[in-house]
Amino acid sequence: MVAHPDDETLWAGGFVLEHSEWDWFIGTLCRASDLDRAPKFARVLECLHACGGMLDMDDGPEQRPLPALDVQRQVLRLLPGSHFDRLLTHGPQGEYTWHRRHREVCQAVVALWRAGRISADALWLFAYEDGERQYLPRAVRNAHVKHSLPPEVWRTKFDLMTQVYGFHPESWEARTTPRTEAFWCFESRGQLDKWWRERGLAV
């Protein structure tokens, strides 16, 4: 569950590609009416052998805060079922400095999973940081899971970003495309709450 079409590829595309036999659903909360990005997202879903859906929450440049309950309602509206083996979404600080929608989607998914309104055996949060804009986003050093992508998998992911989504090879998005993917991983609410508190985040 991501904020924007391309987030799924940028932050977890290698993982999806390496588990293409899984029954993937990819949802994005923004850009359903974007005549450029929406059809590209549909093509990426085909390349990833995934199902998916889009909604059209506000994503204007002002990045006005969205009511937390509204974001949660949209997440539930988009999800196709009641139970999932693994749920992937943004990290609590986003993946770079900084995008409000990434944080809001994380907060919504975490709140729903913690409350039992989304059932999933495991919750994985993207684990990337950019040193407060000191460098391109990269895997957090002590993330629970870090996986260096085989060259051919990374190339496929890079091609999705540049040839399907259409980002220039020298764009921020293309240069960011991680060769190592990383996640914070939780199998219980207790694990998540402990980790959340240790980082000074509001539970």
Which residues make up each language-model segment?
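Active-site adenylate/phosphate-handling loop in enzymes that bind or generate adenylated species
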Residues: P80-W124
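Divalent metal-coordination and catalytic microenvironments
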Residues: D6, F41, L87, R101, ...
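Active-site rim/loop-helix segments in enzyme catalytic domains that contact anionic ligands
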Residues: M1-H83, V110-A120
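Short catalytic/ligand-binding loop motif for oxyanion handling, primarily in non-cytosolic enzymes
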Residues: P61-Q63, E95-H99, C106, E132-Y135
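Active-site environment of divalent metal-dependent phosphoester hydrolases
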Residues: D7-L10, S33-D36, P92-W98, G131-R133
